[in-house]
A protein has these predicted regions:
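Interaction-mediating elements
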Residues: 24-129
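Short, Lys/Arg-enriched N-terminal segments with co-localized hydrophobic residues
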Residues: 3-24
């Protein structure tokens, strides 16, 4: 039988777990948005989300995956923001999604999609030099 608690504490010492978790969450991945647009709003994005979830800005990561959305052979203007973190209540997700939408929508994208991905730290491994 799988015991998540055992695995977590077996991989990461209990006193290091909270520190490690706070360093890497949340992870934001943006697609379908211009690099210059994302750079323009990155500070506001971090500040806004940090305030809502009470996390230090230094715990965030932000990556841009350049992509183009296509519908019926035509490019469409759609920004897709994915936030990966340890699961939070739907009310928190709604609040963050609304705030992110308010920040991205004025940039002129027809559609702004915000989604959340729950990360189970028992299945995550980080390798460094």
């Amino acid at each position: 039988m799988f015991n998540k608690k055992y695995i977590l504490y077996d991989i990461i010492k209990e006193n290091e777990y909270k520190i490690w978790r706070s360093i890497i969450m949340p992870r934001i991945v943006a697609r379908g948005i211009k690099k210059e647009d994302l750079k323009k709003v990155s500070t506001e994005l971090f500040d806004t989300i940090a305030k809502i979830i009470d996390r230090p800005r230094g715990a965030f990561t932000l990556d841009l995956v350049e992509s183009v959305a296509i519908l019926d052979g035509e490019e469409i203007s759609r920004a897709n923001i994915e936030i990966g973190w340890v699961a939070r209540p739907v009310e928190v997700c709604e609040k963050v999604a609304n705030a992110v939408g308010e920040i991205i929508k004025p940039l002129g994208y027809e559609t702004v999609m915000v989604s959340f991905k729950s990360i189970d730290l028992a299945y995550e491994f980080t390798f460094t030099k």
